[in-house]
């Protein structure tokens, strides 16, 4: 037996939070009566590295655009995704062992 089908109903939601390290994450999405979805999600680290993904999901498929400054990224457009990269330079971090007390 098939479950009863209901037509799509418009909706929207969002949240924005900052964790104990200072990293920020957020998302939002809305859907309409034609079952199309539009939304975004993002994060930003305390040192300024960020990524934002904006998307549309509809009868033609899932289409995303990504804005980022993550190290090692480059601007390109594979498949149906556009990546707008502006990578930042990362300074290497070094760890030193403490000398033991003699």
From Swiss-Prot:
Region (Disordered), start-end ranges: 1-45
One Pfam family, short name: Chitin_bind_4
GO molecular function: chitin binding; structural constituent of chitin-based larval cuticle
Disulfide bond positions: none
Stretches of the chain forming a coiled coil according to its record: none
UniProt feature, compositional bias: Polar residues: 36-45
Keywords: Chitin-binding, Cuticle, Pyrrolidone carboxylic acid
PTM sites of type Pyrrolidone carboxylic acid: 1
Residues of the Chitin-binding type R&R domain: 8-74
GO cellular component, as recorded: chitin-based extracellular matrix
Biological role stated in the UniProt entry: Component of the cuticle of the tick. Binds chitin.
Protein name, entry field: Cuticle protein 10.9
Organism name: Ixodes ricinus
Organismal lineage: Eukaryota, Metazoa, Ecdysozoa, Arthropoda, Chelicerata
